[in-house]
């Protein structure tokens, strides 16, 4: 019997082919009616899910690019701010140095002016002392001339003697 069954499978009869075809068509109808819809729905859902995943990935990529651009802009701004702070610090240091130079120059100029004023006062005091001494000598010489009514030679001699008594420094 197994041989007969095996024989019938190898050499199929028309009836067997007919019933196999009918069974296959019924299977296709049942599959189409009950299986095809859920399978296609499942495939469509999976396709939509994949599309959403791709869309979310693209959105995440765009968001990452935007964040990267913001970070780059923030880095550039921070770099510019740092450069500006350095420039301001250099300018402040230069300004402070110039102010100190000007202050030192003013102090030196004031010291020079004070020294010159002191020298001028000393000079005026020395000149006044010299005038007083010359006036005293002139008065003394005039007194001697008046006391001694002298001739021109004697007068010249008295003036020369008075000048010799005058200190040379």
Swiss-Prot record:
It is found in: Cell inner membrane. Pfam families: ATP-synt_B. GO terms for cellular component: plasma membrane; proton-transporting ATP synthase complex. GO terms for molecular function: proton-transporting ATP synthase activity, rotational mechanism; proton-transporting ATPase activity, rotational mechanism. SUPFAM superfamilies: F1F0 ATP synthase subunit B, membrane domain. It is a single-pass membrane protein. F(1)F(0) ATP synthase produces ATP from ADP in the presence of a proton or sodium gradient. F-type ATPases consist of two structural domains, F(1) containing the extramembraneous catalytic core and F(0) containing the membrane proton channel, linked together by a central stalk and a peripheral stalk. During catalysis, ATP synthesis in the catalytic domain of F(1) is coupled via a rotary mechanism of the central stalk subunits to proton translocation. Component of the F(0) channel, it forms part of the peripheral stalk, linking F(1) to F(0). Belongs to the ATPase B chain family. F-type ATPases have 2 components, F(1) - the catalytic core - and F(0) - the membrane proton channel. F(1) has five subunits: alpha(3), beta(3), gamma(1), delta(1), epsilon(1). F(0) has three main subunits: a(1), b(2) and c(10-14). The alpha and beta chains form an alternating ring which encloses part of the gamma chain. F(1) is attached to F(0) by a central stalk formed by the gamma and epsilon chains, while a peripheral stalk is formed by the delta and b chains. This is ATP synthase subunit b. It comes from Salinibacter ruber (strain DSM 13855 / M31). The lineage of its organism: Bacteria, Pseudomonadati, Rhodothermota, Rhodothermia, Rhodothermales.
């Amino acid at each position: 019997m197994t041989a007969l069954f095996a024989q019938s499978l190898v050499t199929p009869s028309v009836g067997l082919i007919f019933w196999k075809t009918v069974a296959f068509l019924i299977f296709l109808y049942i599959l189409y009616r009950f299986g095809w819809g859920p399978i296609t729905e499942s495939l469509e859902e999976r396709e939509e899910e994949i599309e959403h995943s791709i869309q979310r990935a693209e959105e995440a990529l765009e968001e990452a690019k935007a964040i990267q651009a913001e970070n780059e802009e923030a880095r550039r701004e921070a770099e510019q701010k740092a450069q500006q702070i350095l420039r301001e610090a250099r300018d402040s240091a230069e300004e402070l140095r110039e102010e100190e130079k000007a202050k030192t120059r003013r102090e030196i100029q004031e010291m020079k002016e004070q020294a010159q004023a002191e020298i001028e006062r000393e000079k005026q005091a020395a000149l006044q002392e010299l005038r007083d001494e010359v006036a005293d000598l002139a008065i003394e010489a005039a007194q001697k001339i008046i006391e001694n009514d002298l001739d021109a030679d004697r007068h010249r001699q008295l003036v020369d003697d008075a000048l010799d008594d005058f200190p040379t420094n």
